[in-house]
């Protein structure tokens, strides 16, 4: 198995380093990751400037100022030859649950892999301690994919409780929960009197029902949520069509 591994925490983050070590026990791994933390970069792609890469002695490649999407795009299209069988993103320091997937660079890297035609996993740890647990879970799922390919065309968003491996209760297939909108903005002033703003923490959970990713992780289970790239709201197409007609939108411009 050939694995392209990326993240959004940066190439030196403990999550990606731990996962690379575990994956290299049974797979060919090419790490292509940002040279610094790019958390919250979502699906952004660098189009207005060039991208510089740096290779380490072990073959890992850092992309200067690159986004997670940049890294996977470069990895698939030029940096990993032969190309990958699967794209893996993580291990993220902290969860990507519910609405987090909208902003997550970890999920975005996996989404880019899927967009380019590859099976893709996004892996996050609900904390900052038990990276070995998340790595072991990821390896188990990848071995399962090797034995029995999953042909859903979906991204698997995997969230792992921050627990020792022997305390993990199992795996649940879940849906994304949701949070209340985040609305906290923290103002500060720099020494010159200019106003600075920090975006505050995410909102509290508002939908954490028993079938959600929030509930699974809180109860000690690994959450596996299938995600898809197609954002079309098919069930709303007829509703929007009817609304346009009733509202009398004139297409004779």
Curated annotation (Swiss-Prot):
TM stretches of this protein: none
Binding site for a divalent metal cation: 8-9, 39, 92
Record keyword Metal-binding present: yes
Location(s), subcellular: Cytoplasm
Entry GO terms, CC: cytoplasm
Matching InterPro entries: SurE (IPR030048), SurE-like_Pase/nucleotidase (IPR002828), SurE-like_sf (IPR036523)
KW Transferase (keyword) present: no
GO molecular function: 3'-nucleotidase activity; 5'-nucleotidase activity; exopolyphosphatase activity; metal ion binding; nucleotide binding
Record keywords, A-Z: Cytoplasm, Hydrolase, Metal-binding, Nucleotide-binding
HAMAP family in UniProt: SurE
NCBIfam families associated with the record: PRK00346.1-1, PRK00346.1-3, PRK00346.1-4, surE
Protein name per the record: 5'/3'-nucleotidase SurE
Source organism of the structure: Enterobacter sp. (strain 638)
């Amino acid at each position: 198995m050939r694995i392209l591994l990326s993240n959004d925490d940066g190439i030196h983050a403990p999550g990606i380093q731990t996962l690379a070590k575990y994956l290299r026990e049974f797979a060919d791994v090419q790490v292509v990751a940002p040279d610094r933390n790019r958390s919250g970069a979502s699906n952004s792609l660098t189009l207005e400037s060039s991208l510089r890469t740096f290779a380490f002695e072990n073959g890992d490649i850092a992309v200067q100022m690159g986004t997670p999407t940049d890294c996977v795009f470069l990895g698939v299209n030029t940096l990993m030859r032969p190309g990958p069988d699967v794209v893996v993103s993580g291990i993220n320091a902290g969860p990507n649950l519910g609405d987090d997937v909208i902003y997550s660079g970890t999920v975005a890297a996996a989404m880019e892999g899927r967009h380019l035609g590859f099976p893709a996993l996004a892996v996050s740890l609900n904390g900052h301690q038990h990276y070995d647990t998340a790595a072991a879970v990821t390896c188990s799922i990848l071995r399962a994919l090797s034995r029995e390919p999953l042909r859903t065309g979906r991204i698997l968003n995997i969230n792992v409780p921050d627990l020792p491996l022997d305390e993990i209760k199992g795996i649940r297939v879940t849906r994304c929960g949701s949070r209340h909108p985040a609305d906290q903005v923290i103002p500060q002033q720099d020494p010159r009197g200019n106003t600075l703003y920090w975006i505050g923490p995410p909102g509290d959970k508002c939908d954490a029902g028993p079938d959600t990713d929030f509930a699974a992780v809180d109860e000690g289970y690994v959450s596996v949520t299938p995600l898809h790239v197609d954002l079309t709201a098919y069930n709303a197409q007829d509703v929007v069509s009817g609304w346009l007609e009733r509202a009398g939108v004139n297409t004779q411009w």
